[in-house]
Amino acid sequence: MRKIFLTAVLMLGAMSMSAQLATVQNVQRIDAGVSVDKPVISADGSFVVAQAGAKGIVKITADGTCTTVAKASGAYNLRLTADGQNVVFAAPEYRSNHLRYVSLKSANLATKSVRTLVKASRRLNSGVGIEGNSVTAVENGKARVQSLDGTKAVRSAVASINYGHLDVTVNGKTRSIDPQGRGSYIWPSISPDGQKVVYWLVGRGCFVCNLDGTGVQRVGELRAAVWAGNDRLVGMDEVEGTAQQVTASSLRLYDLASGVSQTITDDTVKAQFPSASADGSRIAFTTPEGELYIVTLTK
C-alpha cells in the first residue's frame, strides 16, 4: 500500500512539474524584408523595435510594416519607454585614439528625432532603467536620470555587468552584489516591479535574487532570460552549437512561484533572445538567420 501511495505522489509531482502554464495560440513569422537582431516588443505587444544592420533601428508591426526609426547601425541594448513612444539605445563609436566610447540616446518613433541622453563616455554602464518615460543610466557608478516628456524624472533600479560583476544601482547608489561570489555574470534583467533581478552565472545557470543579492532562487538552464510579468520568465533552452553558430534552441516559460516550466517553441525554429509584452501574452524572438517571430499565448 505504501508503494502505491509513493508511486501516486511521484506521478502527481511529475504531472505538476509538466503542467501547462499557457496555451500557444500562434507562432507567427513576421516577414519585414530585413534581418533583425535582439527584438524588443512593446508593452501592449503591438510592435517590436530591433537592430537591422545598416538600416539602423527599425520598428516592425505585426503585418510586417517596417520603418527606420534611427540610423544607428551599431546600436545595442534597446529599451522601449512604457508608452511605446521612444526607444532608448546605446550608441558606440571609435575615436582617433582607437578607443571605444558609448553614448546613450533616445529616438522618438513618430518624429524620428534623436536625442543624446548621456554623452559618449568610456565609463557608461551597460544597464538602463525605465520608469514610465524616465530613463536612468549609470556612468562610472553614478546614476543619471532624465525625463523624455518633460515631466518630473523618476529614478529606477538598474542592473548591469561590470568586468563580470553583477552591479545593481538603487536610489542612485551602485554596488556589486555577486550573489554567488566572484564569477562571470551576464544577462541581468530587473523585474517590472523593481524587486528582483534575473541573471546568468557562467558555468552555473540562471538565477533570480532580491536587489541586495539575498533570496537566491535557481531557475536552471534558461539563457538570456527576461521577465514576462513579475512572476514569470522566458528564456532560451536546449541550446546547441557554439556562440558563433547556434544549431538548435527553443524558448521556455518558467513560473517562479511553482517552479513549473513549459517549452513554447518546437524544433522547427531556432528561437533566441526573447522579449515579452507587459502581461507576457506576446513574446518576440529572432533566429540566428535574422528572422523575426511572435508567439501569442493565452492562460
Language-model features: where?
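Positively charged n-region of N-terminal signal peptides that target proteins for export
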Residues: 1-4
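General helical structural elements
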Residues: 6-7, 119
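Hydrophobic h-region of N-terminal signal peptides that target proteins for export
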Residues: 9-18
